[in-house]
């Protein structure tokens, strides 16, 4: 689960509840202070060092597809104030982008627009920070399809993918995609670049059905168990 600084949604706060999941980010570079005793950066570095000493890699769950600012009715906390029209994607109106309607392919009120150079640079800088300064070993990207949308559509040759591959720091770390979002044609399992690993929900569903005793699952179970060649032919 994410460790970058996050906020509770206004609706939860109205109900007296707290978001402990972390999928509502507000600062891409900052460790969540509530997870530490006071010196969050120092404590995070110490944690990573000790995990490495124990022979464990550190893979961060990161959320760069949206922020806690939500849609047009949400608060102005960060990116909206800097450049709302640049950092976020918007629905298309009769005469171009409708800046009163944030695109919402994430289901969280807004969608960060990595088709814009400022957004792309922000995310790349944040990733490099976690690798070079915090010494993590890789990332699991929440709703990764959103990061590769250009003009609203998923592009396996997007600027985001190209930049990740060309970056001397990021090209050597582990990259894991959640290969979907809720936007049009948002399910993209098996369509990420070969340098990426993908969360395989077909494996999850098939194994569950097999152990549940559903009929006719033996062949599909075997396919999933040996690597889902039908979904990931580029890796064979």
Cite the ranges covered by each PLM segment:
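Substrate-binding/active-site clefts of carbohydrate-active enzymes
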Residues: 2-135, 140-166
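Conserved alpha/beta catalytic core and glycan-binding cleft of carbohydrate-active enzymes
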Residues: 135, 150-151, 156-236
